[in-house]
Amino acid sequence: KLDACEESADDLMLKEDSAAYAWSGKRVSYEEFCEITENNEDRYEYIDGEIYLLAAPGVSHQMFLANLYTLFNNWFMGKPCRVFFSPFDVTLANDALKSKNVVEPDLLVSCDYLTQRNENDRYTGIPALVVEILSPGTRGKDQLKKLNVYLNGGVREYWIVDPRDRKVMLYYFADQQLEDMDLFRDPAVVKSIHFPGLEVSTTDIFAD
């Protein structure tokens, strides 16, 4: 008799959501994080030993991401580097904890994607440029925690796109030090330092 095992779709969804949120905020080792997220459809980040559950992005976030991908992809077409967008895991060294950080940038540019892949076709390299689009739930993490993650992890350039204030903050790193930074308020043209010639209008980024 199977009556005791019958559950509604809503009950199953509630249990899955509860399990997903149960891990958020937990401090675990990198190995434990890999075990938790293996074959797990929920999206997580792992920063400084702590697990972060990634919520589904909103409409505006995805519109601006699509705009950025189109602008970046058009510029990088025919060049040796490629543009990727989330969901796309990036694992970076965390020397302070002698461990690793695992993040999902909204958009990234990789110049080592051909050689830095494991047997499961997972990316193992270091992006040259990373873009994060702020949302209400990620403002603090993207502007503080991820800034340090990318700086210490070997990323060369980090763009923070702020739809609320219609601005883009650009950070340029060299030898794991902040080399330069700039702020572009709409309307403006964001000019990459690491990729000379890559110029993106904020009007095009925030177009709806």
Locate predicted features.
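Gly/Pro/Ser/Thr-rich low-complexity, intrinsically disordered segments predominantly at protein N-termini
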Residues: K1-D208
